[in-house]
Amino acid sequence: MKAELVPVCTAWILGLLLCLGPAAAKVCGPNMDIRNDVSELKQLRDCVVIEGYLQILLISNAKAEDFRNLRFPNLTVITDYLLLFRVSGLVSLSNLFPNLTVIRGRVLFYNYALVIFEMTDLKEIGLYNLRNITRGAVRIEKNSELCYVSTVDWSLVLDAVYNNYIVGNKPPKECVDLCPGAREKMQICEKSSINNEFADRCWSDEHCQKVCPSVCGKRACSDNNECCHPECLGSCTAPDNDTACVACHHYFYEGRCVPTCPSNTYKFEGWRCITREVCAKMHIWIHSTIPFIIHKGECVYECPSGYMLNKSQSMTCSPCEGPCPKICEEKMKTIDSVTSAQMLEGCTVLKGNLQLNIRKGQNIAAELENFLGLIETVTGYVKIRHSHALVSLSFLKSLRYILGEEQMPGNYSFYVFDNNNLQQLWDWSKHNLTIKEGKIRFAFNSKLCASEIYRMEEVTGTKGRQAEEDISLSTNGNMASCESHVLNFTSRSKIKNRIKLTWERYRPPDYRDLISFTVYYKEAPFRNVTEYDGQDACGSNSWNMVDVDLPASKESDPGILLQGLKPWTQYAIYVKAITLTMLENRHIHGAKSKIIYMRTDAAVPSIPQDMISASNSSSQLVVKWNPPSLPNGNLSYYIVRWQQQPQDRHLYQYNYCFKDKVPNRKYANGTIDTEGGTEPTKPEGSVGEKGHYCACPKTEAEEKAEKDEAEYRKVFENFLHNSIFVPRPNRRRRDVLAVGNSTVTSYEKNSTTEDFSNFSDSERDDIEYPFYETKVDYKWERTVISNLQPFTLYRIDIHSCNHEAEKLGCSASNFVFARTMPAAGADDIPGIVNTKEEDDGVIFLGWPEPLRPNGLILMYEIEYKHQGEVHRECVSRQDYRKNGGIKLVRLPPGNYSAQVQAISLYGNGSWTEMVSFCVKLKPDVRNNILQMVVAIPLALSFLLVGIISIVCFVFKKRNSNRLGNGVLYASVNPEYFSAAEMYVPDKWEVPREKITMNRELGQGSFGMVYEGIAKGVVKDEAETKVAIKTVNEAASMRERIEFLNEASVMKEFNCHHVVRLLGVVSQGQPTLVIMELMTRGDLKSYLRSLRPDTESNSGQPTPSLKKMIQMAGEIADGMSYLNANKFVHRDLAARNCMVTEDFTVKIGDFGMTRDIYETDYYRKGGKGLLPVRWMSPESLKDGVFTTNSDVWSFGVVLWEIATLAEQPYQGMSNEQVLRFVMEGGLLEKPDNCPDMLFELMRMCWQFNPKMRPSFLEIISSIKDELDPGFKEVSFFYSEENKPPDTEELDLEAENMESIPLDPSCALQNSEHHAGHKSENGPGVVVLRASFDERQPYAHMNGGRKNERALPLPQSSAC
């Protein structure tokens, strides 16, 4: 009760506190930063709403008990984000914030509203009342002990989950993750589907995740599942009450949630309404002298862009005439990122100096223009330095004046230095700039030609102010296309990874102006590079540069030896002369060469990468690897070498007869691509886990996620640097594995291993096994190593070799260890167990060892029996090596049997055959025993004869009773039948002239079925399309009557989801039965028509999960109607369900499909046809048919729907299916089958019939997914629906064809039916008891007292 009052109190307190104002300190803010000590958490005491973010971080050396007494139940809302980082000792948030309900995410931490990062002790999140994160995503990362992450359905908390990033936490396989009730197998928590996994949703083993009823839609709900008021967010304490909300969807005002703020109040911080007086005091809370202002109904910190503060009314904003003159005072504003530029957004006058230092950035020009594009005047100077990301200054599109009130040393007002990519200042035909005071200075702007600078002199009015050295002609434009002479290479050669070049000596007009040369080179896989490639606006420069001094002799050509190049790599190279000569146009007059391409020599490749190995069988290992990162040539082949490893001799130090467990038993099951027919298989003769061997390439989404992760980590580290202390130092990279330094210079092709050594050799720890090797072509990157020993560890080395391997050798090796799979029968003891009597009551058992076991033999287990008692003994490996067996001592006299099994490193071998031995008696006792041995068998013989006599008498008596009461005798007049069997016309009779037959639909049980038109058979319909069933002309009178009697039973059906009988034409020939027309045929044919790869495809899409559930509900509704009326169907399958024009599925007419799908039936023991693939285990075994067995068949129908009518148990014969089902086998989950549908199937396939749900329970579990129209027509929602009884009628029979076909016969004595035979296959059975209401129950051999059977349709196949 106390817990239920918390939200009520919270909502009431929240309204009270907001009325009282900030003094009550219940609305905490603007931000809460908790760090360094647990005691700092006391700042949160009494907080109901945190207006801003909550950060709890960097609390080290804390223990779990430090948090036990800390509890903040009042906190319900955080308006920004929640961040937890490196807080030790905190195990769960459930006690800390039990009522935190909403995180609004108004301000996000790098797109995330909830960040849990590197919380080393956190075991569960535990925010069990968190219902809504309004904006932002979730990032939960690197929490090594965190479980209960996959049990939370974040789609119930967030509107979109695709931006969530949850990685690096405790592996799910190591987490228990049991929701409340799971241990007791009780359904307490709601279920939902995430990534095709339909499971319970919870925050911990004590708290379920709250799921509101579907009727609430997007509205919140209370803890009692009552729908809240539409203005409530998260939760509420009373339904449809806007004063009982825990949080508000829009705004909070005076204890009530409102869609918008009332008049004379103003929106504040996106969640509450305050008065003008409160807004005026807000600056006190922010610790600032600048008051808040009111604009467009909101209390805001400053006027937005396009508005300025109204001087007459200090708390309001007024629009500007043109651009707002927004003056920003900054002594020195340095722009080094988009974030820093954002601080000047909207500024038109910068009162101070502007410095640009933009080294990197993507789409940087657009971002800078957005934030700096309104600046018109800079009162000081402008300095642009090291801004490699800038190509132009056009983003300062409004800059008109640089006043130069403050200047740099040297009296510079415009200073441009070392901007590698700057090529343009402004478009001077459209831009005008005036520099009132000071000079300009340009240096080391390699792509900015002098003409651009001289143009700026003229426009800005600074021409003549600066000296010539202020505009360096040698460093500005030196990498632009200002040269005029082409240098030619005179020689070029290569030696391994070095390139030697010489070129002609350039002779400028004045030789003194030639300073030096610069050689540019870069890797160039393709011959399509240009001089400016790689020098983009992101600041990168992919060209390597080397300065070359002039040679001492004027006659010598300059040259260079480029060293340290990558082997077998093509390089692009060009050389440029550095001069001081100027022409009349004041451009630099220099020289450069054309780009040439050269490839270095090959070298030894690096090692292969990413080696993995998996066992393919007991004698094979599959090895896969990736190419070397540096092939250093054309990769040619790989050398694969392998070596058997000796067994671990330390394993023999233990006596495993006294150990709780044997060593870990694992073989290689790595991830291997299954191409090439080398897919790993299960252990021979055993059932193993299904491995996954597909290494999928990364998708674009995965690559983007990795990029985002790296970017997030960078931002997060920057946050730590700016907010906490210093970033973590770079970690040293750890070698994944060590490899040898030697290279392989030769190889011997050998893909198999030598003859195996005997087992005794394998037990030696000093043996060194030889290496074997084979050569694999470079295209394959995988191989299969064969002829290996079972369950044995191997080392596998791989060397990569390129086209120069004969000269240079191959790479060092990369290696991996892998164990082969166990071999079936390898641990079996060969031969027999030998026995030897050594003394009175002492028997020695000896046996040979397995020849090549799966690893080491650890022990032997002996089982011997005496007089029904089983005894076990254990022999350790050490004892066996000493004695060769075991002595059984103090054995009482008598006959014994014994068997032995070996236990290896892998597991248990098979038991040997039983060996019998006798422990003899002492001589003085043998005579007495001999008398007993003779007497006892004689007595038993007499007893056995008496029992047999009694059994024979009883059996004979019982048969005589049956002969008189149940056997049908051949009639003298076979044409005679009882008058009770005659069909009597009734109100269902339809005049023949009202029936018109149009076209054939197919062959039915008794004859052809037609489509036709009937007049007046349906109320308020003049004509109705119908299905017309007929009887063959050659049918006998009995067959015609049975045909009509079957129709008579259908008269009792009145359910929307059961095919209806509309009328009967019994007068004249042929006899007709008028049925409801199912235009789309049977469900099986309909489902197959939806297969996209079939010729008969109807063009309709494959059914969605909702459509499948709709079909299931309609079939279950029809079956629940039959169940309520004591009918057992016995042949529920897709072929016996029909589909209407509007795609409604109904239980069929119980006989029309038998001939069409004869292959779906199986004749057991030469008797009637049985649908074994749809039958339950109890029906197959004992011939028992109940509603529970119909539920089993319903599960198979669901499987048919999911597979579009594939045959169940495909690949098995009918006999195999019969054994498989009776032994507990189930159908596998179909491909792409939704978890919800498969879960429904599994419930129907419970082996215990009583554990299966009823049809009403099935509908109840899926009713929320069904169409609204289902309520109007279904039996489930009708007044007739009553809960089914569960008591069964005890009926027994073997053959389905023995059920009486004539309903009138059932009204006579039941003994007549006991012997009645029919050729019909399975159908529907009606069981009705006049004296009570019991669960429908039927048996193949017919019924008993007070029952009535539905006549089964005849089948020519029977």
UniProtKB/Swiss-Prot annotation:
CDD domains: FN3, FU, PTKc_InsR_like. InterPro entries: FN3_dom, FN3_sf, Furin-like_Cys-rich_dom, Furin_repeat, Growth_fac_rcpt_cys_sf, Ig-like_fold, Kinase-like_dom_sf, Prot_kinase_dom. Residues 735-934 are extracellular. Residues 483-603, 604-702, 727-818, 829-924 form the Fibronectin type-III domain. The modification Phosphotyrosine is found at residues 976, 1157, 1161-1162. Disulfide bonds join 28-47, 147-175, 179-202, 189-208, 212-221, 216-227, 228-236, 232-245, 248-257, 261-273, 279-299, 303-317, 320-324, 328-347, 449-482. SMART domains: FN3, FU, TyrKc. The chain crosses the membrane at residues 935-955. Tetramer of 2 alpha and 2 beta chains linked by disulfide bonds. The alpha chains contribute to the formation of the ligand-binding domain, while the beta chain carries the kinase domain. This is Insulin-like growth factor 1 receptor. It comes from Xenopus laevis.
